[in-house]
Amino acid sequence: MKEYRLTDWLPTTKKEIELRGWDSVDVILFSADAYVDHPSFGAAVIGRTLEAAGYTVAIVPQPDWHGDFRDFKKLGRPNLFFGIAPGCMDSMVNKYTAGKRLRSEDAYSPDGRHDCRPEYPTIVYTKILKQLFPDVPVVLGGIEASLRRLTHYDYWKDSLQKCILCDSGADMIIYGMGEKPIVELCRNLAEGLPISAVHDIPQTVYLCREKEIPNGIGDDDIVLHSHEECLRNKKAQADNFRHIEEESNKMHAQRLLQAVDNKYAVVNPPYPPMTSDELDRSFDLPYTRLPHPKYKGKRIPAYEMIKFSVNLHRGCFGGCAFCTISAHQGKFIACRSKRSIVEEVKKVIDMPDFKGYLSDLGGPSANMYGMHGNNPKACAVCKRPSCIHPQVCPNLNTDHSKLLEIYHAVDALPGIKKSFIGSGVRYDLLLHRSKDEAINAVARQYTRELITKHVSGRLKVAPEHTSDAVLKLMRKPSFKLFGEFKCIFDRINREEHLNQQIIPYFISSHPGCREEDMAELAVLTKQLDFHLEQVQDFTPTPMTVSTETWYTGYDPYTLEPVFSAKTPREKLAQRQFFFWYKPEERRAIEQELRRIGRADLIQKLYAGVPAPNYGRNFGNNRRPEFERRDGRDEMDTRDSRKGRNNRNNKSGYKGRKPKW
C-alpha cells in the first residue's frame, strides 16, 4: 500500500494550497458531494484533468450555504473561474423519494448525513458566488445542470422550469462528460478572452441575445419552441424533447436554440465520443482512490459501494425511456484499453482492505464493452435513440469477445479471487442471434462464464415490466426474453451444481401502465416463483422520454396521448401489486381487482392460500403510501439503482459513474 501525503489530494483549504507552494489557484470547484479522489466522482475527475493540463485547482466539498458563507470565501478569488460540481446524482433524487419524502441517508456524504447539501446546489452555490464575486465567471457541470440545460419539467416543483442558467445566474454549462470542454475553456480564459465571448466550444450551453448568436440562426440549427410556448402548450414541450433526444444520440449533432426571457439558450453540439487513448488518459490520472483525509473515521456510503469496482467504458445504446445515460454520456460506446483496466485493477489489489473480490467490473451497462456499428457511415447518419429497440440494429456488432478478454486478463492477476458483475446485464444482447455463428458461440460462452464465474449469488437484471405495451413505452424487450434468459440461468445452475438466484427489477406507475398491467405482472411473477424485492415507483427526472410523457401526457415521438398514474391513490393502487404475497396487502388487492373488473385474477394470485382473518384491526400494519417496505424511506427498494437516476437518474453510485 502506497503511503500518501496530504499534498497527494487536490487542496481543499488555504493551508493545503500553501503546502503546494501556490499563491493562487486557477479554478476553484465547489462540490455537493464529499471529496473522494476517485474516477467515479466528478469533481475529482475534473480537478485531476485540469491539473494534468497544467492548471492549479482546489476543491471545496459540501460548503456551508448558511450564515456568513465563509466556506465560499475561504480560498478567495480564482484566476479563471468557479466551477460547480453539484454531485454524482441529481440533488433532488438524492434528497427525496418518489413520494417526496426526505431520504434518511445521503450516500455521497460522510456518515450518510442528509443535511450536507441544499436542494438544487447548482443554483444555491452560484447565487452565493455571484453575490460575493460578481465579476468572476461561474461554470456549471454535472448531472444536475446537464439535464436542465433547456426547458424541463421539475417533479419536485411540479412545474416547467427554464434553462438552469436563467435561475442560477451562471455564465456557462458544460454538459455531459466534461474533460475536453473544460480544458478548452481554461485555454480560452487564460488567453484573456472574457467568458461572454467564448461561444465556440462544443458541449457548452450559454445565453445570449439573438443578434449575438455566432453566425446567426442558420439552416443547420434546430430552433425549438420557446420556453413561453411550452408553458402554454404541452405538445410543444413534447415535440421539443424529440429533437433534444435525437441530437443527444447523433454522431454529428446540430446546434439547438431555444428562446427564453428575450434571450436564446444556445446548446453547442457535443464532442465526438472519446477515443480509447483519451479515455485511458482520464482514468490513468494520479487518483489516490481514497476519500480526503479530512473524513478519517467517517464512512461515505457511495465510496464503500464502488471502492473495489472498475469501470470499463462510457456510453449506453440501450435507450431506456426512463434513463438519462444517453443524454449525459451518449449512445456510442467509448472503451478503455485492456492495459488501462488491468493497471487500475492492480491499484485496487494494493489497497490494504482488499480481500480479492472485485465488486463490479462493468459500466453503464455490463455487457456493451467493445460493441459498435459494423459500418461507421451508417452510424454517422443514425438518430435512433436505441441500437437494440425495438429490434437489435443489423449494423450493430454484438460480439462479446473483447469483454471476455478483459474478464480473463483481470481474473488471471495475482490477488484476484473473483470479479463480480454487479448489475446491468442486457440479456437481450445475449439472446440476440447474429448472422455470424462465431458471434453467437461467443455469446453462449459469455453467458455461461457470467453465470458460473461472475455472480456473487444473485444476478440482477432489469425486465422492468411484464406488459408488452408498457415495455414498448419503456423501450425494453418483451418479457418473454426474460423468461428465456431465466430458463438458461436455471439450466446452467443445475449443470454446474450452483444455487444462485436471478433478481429482477421492476417499475410501477410508468407512463402507459395501469392497475390491470400491474395485476398481470403480479400473476406472471408469481408463476415464476418470485417474491419481488427490487422494485420502485417511477420518479420523473429531467431529460428523459418517460418524464416528458408523464408531464405532457403525450408520446414525444408520436404525439399520441398516454395515460400516467399521478395521484398518490393511483400510484399506491399500482404499487401494492408488487407485494401480493404479504397478508396485509391482500384485502386491498382483492378490492382493487374487483374495482377494475379483474376479479378473475384473485383466484390466480391466491388459489390455495388461506385467506387471512380480516379482523377489525387487520391492515393497520400496512405501510404509509410512500414509505419503503423495509421501514426506511419508501418503496424504492432497489439497491443503488444509480446511474440511471436511481435508474431514472442513470447517475447513482453502483456501476453508474456520471461526471462532468
Language-model-detected regions and their locations in the chain:
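Conserved, mostly hydrophobic/aromatic
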Residues: 171, 282, 316, 341, ...
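N-terminal pre-triad scaffold of radical SAM enzymes
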Residues: 30-35, 296-324, 357
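Conserved SAM/AdoMet-binding glycine-rich loop
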Residues: 29, 45, 59-60, 65-68, ...
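Nucleic acid-processing catalytic cores of prokaryotic defense/repair systems
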Residues: 25-31, 38-79
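Terminal amphipathic helices with adjacent charged low-complexity linkers/tails
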Residues: 66, 196-249, 271-274, 336, ...
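Flexible, glycine-rich loop/tail regions that form catalytic "lids" or insertion modules at the edges
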Residues: 19, 27-31, 73, 201-204, ...
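Flexible glycine/acidic-rich beta-alpha junction loops that bind and position SAM and/or redox cofactors
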Residues: 90-99, 147-149, 179-184, 209-213, ...
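Glycine-rich beta-alpha loop elements in corrinoid/cobalamin-binding modules
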Residues: 42, 61-260, 267-273
